[in-house]
């Protein structure tokens, strides 16, 4: 099943992929499709390998190539994206159900929130990770670390505490 969407753009006769929705390892620049050469971005180097009609996007992390996902160029109907999005946002087996996941990039850094903790990755430095102990810490991180205005809601603290208590804090 297809649950992810890339944009294919042709600029000056050269095809590029653009991906703005892959979370923590999202490429932070368009990537040329028709080369297997290593491509620099403001963050990690990436490469796209091709095997027949199948492409694989990889990122170099700590000197190792890491497979992110595979894709092809088969056109997708809008309804296919609707069904895929519905599945990942509602099916009990979806890795996104019951989760709070946030990612943000900036010059030379990536910040992610998930699994009850925060990770900060800076280019050329060791990653930093820390747990979020309670709902107040999660809300403060969303506001200060990610620039998200968190609206007041009577059930918000309880929902975050339930998420933290469900095992979300097992790893950062």
Locations of regions flagged by a protein language model:
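Mixed-charge, low-complexity segments
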Residues: 1, 12, 17, 23-32, ...
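Short beta-strand scaffold segments in enzyme catalytic cores
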Residues: 5-8
């Amino acid at each position: 099943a297809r649950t992810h969407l890339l944009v294919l753009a042709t600029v000056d006769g050269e095809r590029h992929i653009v991906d703005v929705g892959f979370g923590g390892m999202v490429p932070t620049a368009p990537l040329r499709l028709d080369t297997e050469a290593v491509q620099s971005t403001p963050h990690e180097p990436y490469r796209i390998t091709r095997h027949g009609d199948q492409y694989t996007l990889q990122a170099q992390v700590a000197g190792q190539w890491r497979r992110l996902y595979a894709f092809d160029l088969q056109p997708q109907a809008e309804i296919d994206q609707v069904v895929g999005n519905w599945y990942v946002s509602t099916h009990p087996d979806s890795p996104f159900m019951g989760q709070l996941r946030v990612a943000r990039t900036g010059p030379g850094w990536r910040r992610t929130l998930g699994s009850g903790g925060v990770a900060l990755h800076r280019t050329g430095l060791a990653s930093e990770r820390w747990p979020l102990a309670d709902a107040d810490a999660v809300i403060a991180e969303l506001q200060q670390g990610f620039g998200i205005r968190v609206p007041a809601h009577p059930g918000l603290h309880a929902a975050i505490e339930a998420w933290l208590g469900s095992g979300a804090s097992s790893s950062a």
